Amino acid sequence: MSHLLSKRASARQRLHFSVFNFDNAPEGFEPHPDPLWLDAGMPNAGFFPIDSLQINVVDYPFQKSLSLPLGNSSIENLNHKDTGVEESLKRLTTTGESKNHVMVTKRTNDPKLIDLSRGLQYSEVEGIPQLLEFTRNLIKRAHPPKYDDWTTIVSNGAGDGLNKAMDAFLDPGDVILVEEFTFTPVLLNIQNAGGIPVPIKLNLDATSGKSEGIDFEYLKNLLENWDELRPELEKKKPKALYTIASGQNPTGFTQSIEFRRKVYNLAEKYDFAIIEDDPYGYLTLPPFSDPDVIHKISDFLTIEDYLAHHLIPSYLTLDTSGRVVRIETFSKLFAPGLRLGFIVGHKDVIDVISKYSNIVTRSSSGTSQLIVNNVIEQSFGGVDGWLNWVLKMRFAYTKRRNVLLGGLFDSEAYKKGHLNVIDPRAGMFTSVIINFPEGTNVPEKMRLLSFKLRAVGVKVVAGLNMAVDKSFSEPRGNFFRLTYAIAGSDSELREGAKRFVSAVEEFFKKGLEF
């Protein structure tokens, strides 16, 4: 694995003046068991102006707007009767000591919690130990790697994690494969490391089961005939693949475990790393269903069923040589403003990332770490409590996805064949493909339609805005990315869908003119 690391990352050293060198100690030397600290430039916790924090935690997304009681209830202890979800939730009552109020004090004796004396202090570059332990336990539960020499490091969110992963693998001039439509800010991380992004064609067939994102045959052929197909790269082989394998941004496609296995086998054969960006993967989604159907408590999955049959295993679970690095974030499941995530990979990879972190970011925010860790451990109840929260998020996102897609599917624009809709199996995005007549100047008509959509009052993202190489992807750039995450209510989603399809319908009636 070490041969794939960048020369820049491999050459970094650790350096700190307070590290004592015990080499060549005089005979008979024994370190004092409890020395006094007169070396560290750290203020004593008594100087911190904050004595305690109280965090009030909800049981369910949108709990306040639904007027649900605070009960610290889990999905698995709800009464699974044939009752509508909202009605059942409103009947919940608090029993026993509430765990909806998390108190963070200056000091605690609970080894799983982070107190203010630790959270407000300088801390380890790798992350505060309690949160690090949670990240490792989560990976063991949800995506256990096949080898033992793996570990995690806390990051300042997925963007920071991606920047550090690119630095770990890419030297100037190194080639990295990227899905042709992607989270384009990552291109800046690649550029910062000096890498060369090469787009991989996606299969944008919206028919259910017809596509898993990456066009595998295209990828396979590209690798088999690399020198002939990419002569301008002067026989530089790909060093890595960057992929959003679940709920792909922007398309919404999700790769099955069988598909991932085929891609991983290519990585072994052609010796490249896989950088797996997974901000949305825990938000698995069932196929679209009527949004007006009253869902029952029994529709909730158990944690075991979710892990066994719904959560797609990470590339980590296939990795036998340490070539997979997984980027996780708390942004989509907790809160993005905390700027907190973590990276999973082989210890050699995490070591070079740790050395880079020591230069560019040092440790992540201690306040963010204590909020996330203590809410999960004290209110949710550890790893399974966190997964229980994920299932509640999943349920809410499923309903929202159904509301938005229902508005699209019921439209005249859809029934007339003006558009197709990708039904996502994970995440917070769907893509709507506009079916222009053959020979249409797609970029120009997408530009005009974008103005039409803004004029009717709906903001979406044009597919070509998320292309790695617009000239390469122009034939497949006839889509818009829509999200069901930011809207404040189901009525906003319905109105957004209504405005979108009305603009498309009018655009086609006017002969593809504004």
Which ranges hold each PLM region?
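N-terminal "arm"/small-domain region of PLP-dependent enzymes with the aminotransferase-like
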Residues: S2-G127, A455
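Short, solvent-exposed loop/turn segments at secondary-structure junctions
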Residues: G41-A45, G159-D160, T182-T184, D205, ...
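Conserved core of the PLP fold type I
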Residues: S65-D271, I275, G281-L318, N420, ...
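Conserved core segment of the aminotransferase class I/II
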Residues: N77-T95, M103, P111, F134, ...
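Short, conserved charged micro-motifs
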Residues: L170, E438-L448, D490-R494
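Conserved glycine-rich beta-strand-loop-beta hairpin in the small C-terminal domain of fold type I
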Residues: V390-L405, F409, G417-P437
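PLP-dependent enzyme catalytic core of the Aspartate aminotransferase-like
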Residues: V456, A467-F514
